[in-house]
Regions:
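Hydrophobic transmembrane alpha-helical segments in integral membrane proteins
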Residues: 1-17
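Membrane-helix exit/interface motif
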Residues: 21-25, 46-60, 82-89
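Loop-to-helix transition at the N-terminal end of transmembrane alpha-helices
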Residues: 29-47
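Short alpha-helical packing/oligomerization segments
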Residues: 56-84
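Individual transmembrane alpha-helices with interfacial aromatic-anchor signatures
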Residues: 99-112
Length: 125
């Protein structure tokens, strides 16, 4: 594994931790708190950084896992923007049901992409 791939793997694990704190905070409070939005934004930054490291380290832009990862990153980016917009417009108001469910779906999809990457490495593909 190249140093860039190692950096990407380490960074994506940090993104997982950050996304998890952000999503769990939002889901439990049913509100977009400052803490939740901070961890979601950090997660997106780490995720983008990890994605760039992995593309450069692997030398391939388009793979099946890459497409899965890009779509998962896009989902979390949209979730973060929607959560931030809700916070700006509604302050501490309860998160609407649709946003609450979208958060779960985007996070679940991201975890699927994360796990599939680990499985691909474990299976040597």
């Amino acid at each position: 594994m190249t140093p860039l791939l190692r950096a990407g793997v380490s960074t994506v694990v940090l993104a997982l931790a950050s996304y998890t704190v952000g999503v769990v905070t939002e889901q439990r409070a049913r509100r977009v708190t400052r803490r939740a939005i901070t961890f979601l934004v950090i997660g997106v930054v780490l995720d983008v950084t990890a994605t760039v490291c992995m593309i450069l380290g692997a030398g391939k832009v388009l793979t099946l896992h890459g497409v899965l990862g890009y779509s998962a990153l896009a989902g979390m980016l949209v979730e973060t923007v929607l959560a931030g917009r809700h916070r700006l417009r509604s302050g501490d108001a309860e998160v609407p049901r649709r946003l609450h469910l979208f958060t779960r779906a985007a996070y679940a999809w991201w975890v699927v992409a994360f796990v599939s990457g680990g499985l691909l490495v474990a299976l040597g593909r």
